[in-house]
UniProtKB/Swiss-Prot annotation:
Residue stretches spanning the membrane: 4-24, 33-53
Family the entry assigns: Belongs to the UPF0391 family.
Keyword Membrane among UniProt keywords: yes
Lineage, top ranks: Bacteria, Pseudomonadati, Pseudomonadota, Alphaproteobacteria, Hyphomicrobiales
Record-given protein name: UPF0391 membrane protein Smed_4051
Record keywords, A-Z: Cell membrane, Membrane, Plasmid, Transmembrane, Transmembrane helix
Length: 57
């Protein structure tokens, strides 16, 4: 997931450098969405690991 966020971030930087602001805004928006999804999934797994980890040991 973070791989795709980085790919869209690089694409948005290239598009911004070339002056295609519409493409840059769209790819930056997609990269932000993917980043936030990855953070939410990380937090869910962190909470699950803390909850289940205590039960296992």
């Amino acid at each position: 997931m973070l791989k795709w966020a980085l790919i869209f971030f690089v694409i948005s930087l290239i598009a911004g450098f070339l002056g295609f602001s519409g493409i840059s805004a769209a790819t930056a928006g997609i990269a932000k969405i993917l980043f936030y999804i990855a953070v939410i999934i990380f937090l869910v797994f962190l909470v699950l690991a803390l909850a289940v980890g205590g039960a296992v040991t």
